């Protein structure tokens, strides 16, 4: 049996694609990936051995387009969707798992049109446009925010290395793989104060910003463990006692799984303000500060007064393992029932 995983564009979608593919591979099931030439899909999976085959279509987003551009993009998606017939026929695809994002549209639409079971995973607290459109046609809709709730699929390494934080000794700034400019600028402003009070600083700034950030810290004579981007990010997260971060789905759940308390500064221009609502889900154990209110004085005060022990204990109790296993179990059970009909 071959299962197609589709979707991506950004790390939040692609992380779930990777984790679910790994779980399917453990069961001996064949998987193919259908993504886009745009976004980060090729960066993540072009050379990956996780999938039996990968396809990258020339799909692009529709949400922010208007007028004739929007109409043309919709026609392009329909054309790409029709083009999926050869891929599905070649691999005898029996089910499609969509992780959302614009690159999920062609394969997900083709699945619906041809009554191939569609399973959707939504990472955010505000449902993405494509997922919202296709939810009614899906065999199952998996979410950690909406009923019936499923545990979030998380890379096991974050759970295995989780520890209770008892005080703040090390502060980590997470700018993401692309580097969030606001987080980077905030880190630079806070670094002298943090260093003065004896805090160790870890700053993940994005590859494109690494040289510039290194020069700034060198000029200010501030000792910072600076990372552009690392596939071993969990090692740095494990060292942190408190993180200053955006609240994209994967980042939020990975920090929670490692029991790292966080000050979340949601990206204000995220679709549907979903980063804010993601963070609200962990409101009991984190601090949420709107970007317009996130000046260095306020953030420094939060760092100094954060009860990280209580938050860390709460996070460790909240996050459950085997999220991916439970979802794949459910998918397989649904497909077995489908075969009996």
UniProtKB/Swiss-Prot annotation:
It is an enzyme of class 2 (transferase). UDP-N-acetyl-alpha-D-glucosamine binds at residues 10-12, 124, 177, 275. It comes from the Bacteria. Its EC number is 2.4.1.227. Pathway: Cell wall biogenesis; peptidoglycan biosynthesis. It catalyses: di-trans,octa-cis-undecaprenyl diphospho-N-acetyl-alpha-D-muramoyl-L-alanyl-D-glutamyl-meso-2,6-diaminopimeloyl-D-alanyl-D-alanine + UDP-N-acetyl-alpha-D-glucosamine = di-trans,octa-cis-undecaprenyl diphospho-[N-acetyl-alpha-D-glucosaminyl-(1->4)]-N-acetyl-alpha-D-muramoyl-L-alanyl-D-glutamyl-meso-2,6-diaminopimeloyl-D-alanyl-D-alanine + UDP + H(+). Gene3D superfamilies: Glycogen Phosphorylase B. InterPro entries: GlcNAc_MurG, Glyco_trans_28_C, GlycoTrans_28_N. One of its GO terms (molecular function) is undecaprenyldiphospho-muramoylpentapeptide beta-N-acetylglucosaminyltransferase activity. One of its GO terms (cellular component) is plasma membrane. It is found in: Cell inner membrane. It holds the Pfam family Glyco_transf_28. GO terms for biological process: carbohydrate metabolic process; cell division; cell wall organization; lipid glycosylation; peptidoglycan biosynthetic process; regulation of cell shape. It is a peripheral membrane protein. Keywords: Cell cycle, Cell division, Cell inner membrane, Cell membrane, Cell shape, Cell wall biogenesis/degradation, Glycosyltransferase, Membrane, Peptidoglycan synthesis, Transferase. Its main location: membrane. SUPFAM superfamilies: UDP-Glycosyltransferase/glycogen phosphorylase (SSF53756). The keyword Cell inner membrane applies. Cell wall formation. Catalyzes the transfer of a GlcNAc subunit on undecaprenyl-pyrophosphoryl-MurNAc-pentapeptide (lipid intermediate I) to form undecaprenyl-pyrophosphoryl-MurNAc-(pentapeptide)GlcNAc (lipid intermediate II). Belongs to the glycosyltransferase 28 family. MurG subfamily. This is UDP-N-acetylglucosamine--N-acetylmuramyl-(pentapeptide) pyrophosphoryl-undecaprenol N-acetylglucosamine transferase. It comes from Campylobacter hominis (strain ATCC BAA-381 / DSM 21671 / CCUG 45161 / LMG 19568 / NCTC 13146 / CH001A).
């Amino acid at each position: 049996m071959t299962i197609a995983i589709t979707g991506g564009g950004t790390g939040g979608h692609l992380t779930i694609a990777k984790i679910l593919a790994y779980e399917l591979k453990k069961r001996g099931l064949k998987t193919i990936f259908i993504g886009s030439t745009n976004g980060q899909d090729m960066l993540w999976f072009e050379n990956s051995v996780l999938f039996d085959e990968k396809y990258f279509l020339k799909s692009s987003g529709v949400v922010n387009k208007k007028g004739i551009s929007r109409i043309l993009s919709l026609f392009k998606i329909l054309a790409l969707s029709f083009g999926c017939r050869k891929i599905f026929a070649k691999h005898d695809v029996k089910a499609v798992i969509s992780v959302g994002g614009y690159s999920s549209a062609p394969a997900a639409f083709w699945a619906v049109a041809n009554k191939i079971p569609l399973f959707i995973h939504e990472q955010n607290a505000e449902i993405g446009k494509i997922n919202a459109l296709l939810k009614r046609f899906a065999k199952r809709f998996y979410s950690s925010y909406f009923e019936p709730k499923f545990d979030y699929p998380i890379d096991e390494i974050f759970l295995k290395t989780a520890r209770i934080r008892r005080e703040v000794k090390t502060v980590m700034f997470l700018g993401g793989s692309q580097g969030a400019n606001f987080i980077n600028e905030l880190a630079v402003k806070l670094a002298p104060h943090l260093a003065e009070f004896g805090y160790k600083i870890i700053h993940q700034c994005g590859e494109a910003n690494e040289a510039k950030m290194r020069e700034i810290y060198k000029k200010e004579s501030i000792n910072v463990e600076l990372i552009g981007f690392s596939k071993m990010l969990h090692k740095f997260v494990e060292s942190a006692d408190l993180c200053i971060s955006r609240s994209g789905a994967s980042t939020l759940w990975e920090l929670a799984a490692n029991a790292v308390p966080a000050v979340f500064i949601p990206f204000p221009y995220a679709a549907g303000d979903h980063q804010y609502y993601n963070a609200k889900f962990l409101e009991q154990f984190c601090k949420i500060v709107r970007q317009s209110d996130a000046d260095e004085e306020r953030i420094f005060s939060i760092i100094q007064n954060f009860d990280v022990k209580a938050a860390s204990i709460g996070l460790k109790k909240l996050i459950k393992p085997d999220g991916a296993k439970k979802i794949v179990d459910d998918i397989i059970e649904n497909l077995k029932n489908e075969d009996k009909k």
